[in-house]
Amino acid sequence: MHAYLHCLSHTPLVGFVDPEQAVLDEVNRVIADARRRIAEFDPELVVLFAPDHYNGFFYDVMPPFCLGIGATAIGDFASAAGDLPVPAELAEACAHAILNSGIDLAVSYNMQVDHGFAQPLEFLLGGLDRVPVLPVFINGVAAPLPGFQRTRLLGEAMGRFLNTLNKRVLILGSGGLSHQPPVPELAKADAHLRDRLLGGGKQLPPDERERRQQRVISAARRFTEDPHSLHPLNPVWDNRFMSLLEQGRLSELDAIGNDELSAMAGKSTHEIKTWVAAFAALSAFGRWRSEGRYYRPIPEWIAGFGSLSATTEI
């Protein structure tokens, strides 16, 4: 059956700290073009690989991968809030299939997700509730992290399952590219932050959430003035990564360790593993071709911002 893929960077800073209007218009055109192609594809099912930013997953239990059999977006940074339309029976069947493939996938019947999941559904489909979705969390910030190889194998297992469904499937990857915003780390946390990282942050009081969001906004403003205030963006790495995906050379990423990736491109760059999972899933459908590649480093959003599509060849 036919499948379509789109991978897109996300940023909570849209509307809070934006680049100049010409750049913003350029990004909006890229997203609008991707949205048009997706609408023409008319998906019957979406599989969304995305990370979390200590809004739904914490160190009380931190799985490398988790499939939401029920999921709700919290609406952080003015992103869309509400329930995701997860087809529960299909999600359960998917979980069984992936576990039977030898991949240790966790499940959640009450998964809480943030802008990392909400933004691609908003930007590319027009809302959270437009198409049934299987939301798959990939841990991209909370060490210890899954590596490229294990993430690729997860994607391949997902693709084999999807290819049995006889549906038009849209495969989305959300995150990256190179970036290192001010994400907390357990090893450096004081007592209050440690409590939040161990699960106390799941239901933050509104004033504390606002202070947390303002810290990110302030960091972005500083980064536009002083590129040394955060880990620099790495356009060379970002473009190399996108080229490897376009050429189907996913396994070449297996040799890159997590510490090496953090040093090259920033500690939140591990979100790009959502792109790897998406392309690995697409590979189960047979021949495909890429299209719509876009890349620009955008310091206002603390991100190497990328967009890339691919479609199976019938």
From Swiss-Prot:
Catalytic-site annotation from UniProt: 115 (proton donor), 179 (proton acceptor)
Pathway(s): Aromatic compound metabolism; 3-phenylpropanoate degradation
Lineage: Bacteria, Pseudomonadati, Pseudomonadota, Gammaproteobacteria, Enterobacterales
Similarity comment: family membership: Belongs to the LigB/MhpB extradiol dioxygenase family.
Free-text function comment from the UniProt entry: Catalyzes the non-heme iron(II)-dependent oxidative cleavage of 2,3-dihydroxyphenylpropionic acid and 2,3-dihydroxicinnamic acid into 2-hydroxy-6-ketononadienedioate and 2-hydroxy-6-ketononatrienedioate, respectively.
GO biological process: 3-phenylpropionate catabolic process
InterPro entries for this protein: DHPP/DHXA_dioxygenase, Xdiol_dOase_suB
Name the UniProt record assigns to this protein: 2,3-dihydroxyphenylpropionate/2,3-dihydroxicinnamic acid 1,2-dioxygenase
Pfam families per record: LigB
Species of provenance: Klebsiella pneumoniae subsp. pneumoniae (strain ATCC 700721 / MGH 78578)
EC number(s) stated in the UniProt entry for this protein: 1.13.11.16
